Amino acid sequence: MRIKNFKFRNVFFCCFFLLISMFSFGQSKKTDEIILTDDGVILNLKGTFKINWDKSDPDVPCSSIGYGRMMFYPENKDIAHNKIIVLMPNDFTFYNQDMNWDYEKEFAENEKAKIEILKKIFPEEVKKMEKIQKGELQSPARVKIKKVTPYTECDFTTVYAQVIELKKIEGAKPKITKLKVKKLDESDDFDDPNPDEFGYLEEYRVNAKDGYANMREKPTTDSKIISKLDNEIIVRYITKYGDWYYVYYADYPSDYKNDPTVKEYRGFIHKSQLEKRVY
């Protein structure tokens, strides 16, 4: 009888520890995607990198290998509510532009930085891309990004982020697809993205018992407060860290004439102080 009980206890404890290990692995896998630094949050993501180019387009300089954006599709569908992330090679902003801002210069600098990234990460593929007028490169990859920014124009929200590291997944083989060059009166044949991938981002309304919620630098109650957000303020979801939501908020000025500055905030709010916005 004791032997049977002993075996039963062994089986029970083995199953118990297996469940704990599986739970811990799942938790660590998600939290490993968020790197907390004193300079802000860095997301370390695995997924698919994609870029297309069209040198038959008359607006594309001959020296430019790509005209499309560097896009990243996170493996974790929870990131930015399963939206495509457009990778920006340099620091960027959509607000508070300097009066002397030179769009053409910035565009040229970004194109140059983009090509440098491609040549560094995909040296062999770039050689092939240079011989193809129109095509698409796709590869499993891992990225580290910061300054995640959901930006809405008209009815579409695009998620942008500054890429600070891009790596091919070891052993993975990038794929280059050659596309047909169409006549000027024909439509483009790049794959149209799913409208949901560029649609409205998941949003939450602040709904705290105290009438406001603290947006914190890190997902702890003793972390530095970045901003106090009143109830009814809408924030945009990026990802979560346990019971804390990492969100984005753009504070537009009430008096543009005297102070046109838009203030951007990214930080953590406990999920108990938020409610999902329903359209």
What is the role of each PLM region?
Residues 1-30:
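Bacterial Sec-dependent N-terminal signal peptides
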Residues 192-243, 277:
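Beta-loop motif signature
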Residues 47-51, 117-154, 237:
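Flexible glycine-rich surface loops and low-complexity tracts that mediate binding to linear polymers
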Residues 177-200, 224, 248-279:
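Boundary regions of SH3-family modules and the immediately adjacent low-complexity/disordered segments
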Residues 79-131:
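Beta-strand/loop nucleic-acid-binding surfaces
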Residues 149-183:
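OB-fold/S1-family single-stranded nucleic acid-binding modules
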